[in-house]
């Protein structure tokens, strides 16, 4: 099972009640640690293609949920410095606004121009739904709209295929997994799925407290937990 790291925001902060923010300095050190361990961060599409071809050794999936504006201003320059790629999961109904679903500090989300800029830089843009709702609480019509309309909006924006999805809050039952597959997504990222698979890929949370020792422990724990192939 692929090793996939899950980030959200990379920015300076005073309060972070949901632990979604990593400081720019910490993030830079985390990326430096990956490089020192001869690991290369890549987007999910590249990772899964390499995994299928048996060429995933030394690769780590890097994912960023929600599409915060600081991805373009803070995270992207560091990724480019190290020659790393990543996947950013965008909430299409909130482009250019803020994280209205969150009761924590307000954080700006990427504008359409910023999304195009990161896509042009080689970052994979994928869907995080339209409104960042917990999908198990939706009816069939709303679920289909969250999946299909968000992808259509992103494909028009980046003028290319959008093949990945990430479940908001990591909430997914077999119903949502089946719906994502039926909607034509090639893969989907979860957090800690009961039954890991290509449309419910586990990810390892990374926060501001994660220095080298904690990162190494998380990598080892992943290797022990997930030994099967996608």
Predicted regions and their residues:
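C-terminal active-site subregion of NodB/CE4 polysaccharide deacetylases
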Residues: 1-63, 68-73, 137-230
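Histidine-centered catalytic micro-motifs
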Residues: 5-6, 125-132
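A short, flexible beta-alpha/helix-coil linker loop
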Residues: 10-14, 93-95, 131-134
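Acidic (Asp/Glu)-rich catalytic clusters
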Residues: 35, 76-83, 108-127, 181
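Active-site glycine- and acidic-residue-rich loops that bind
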Residues: 66-70, 100-109
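A short, conserved beta-to-alpha structural element at the edge of catalytic cores
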Residues: 83-105
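A structural signal for isolated positions on well-ordered beta-strands in alpha/beta enzyme cores
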Residues: 87-89, 126, 164
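Generic beta-sheet signal
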Residues: 89-91, 128, 190-191
């Amino acid at each position: 099972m692929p090793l996939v790291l899950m980030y959200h925001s990379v920015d300076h902060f005073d309060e972070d009640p949901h632990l979604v923010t990593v400081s720019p300095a910490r993030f830079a050190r985390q990326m430096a640690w990956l490089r020192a361990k001869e690991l290369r961060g890549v987007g999910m599409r590249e990772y899964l293609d390499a995994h299928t071809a048996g060429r995933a050794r030394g690769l780590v999936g890097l994912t960023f949920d929600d599409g915060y504006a600081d991805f373009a201003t803070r995270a992207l320059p560091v990724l480019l410095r190290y020659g790393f790629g990543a996947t950013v999961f965008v909430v299409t109904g909130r482009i250019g606004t803020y994280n209205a679903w969150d009761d924590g500090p307000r954080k700006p989300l990427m504008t359409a121009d910023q999304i195009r800029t990161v896509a042009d830089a080689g970052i994979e843009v994928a869907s995080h739904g339209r409104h960042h709702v917990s999908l198990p609480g939706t009816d069939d019509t709303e679920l289909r709209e969250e999946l299909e309309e968000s992808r259509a909006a992103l494909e028009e924006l980046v003028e290319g295929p959008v093949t990945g999805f990430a479940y908001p809050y990591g909430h997914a039952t077999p119903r949502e997994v089946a719906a994502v597959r039926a909607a034509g997504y090639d893969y989907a990222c979860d957090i800690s799925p009961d039954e890991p698979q290509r449309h419910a890929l586990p990810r390892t949370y990374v926060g501001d407290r994660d220095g080298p020792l904690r990162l190494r422990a998380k990598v080892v724990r992943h290797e022990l937990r997930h030994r099967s192939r996608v």
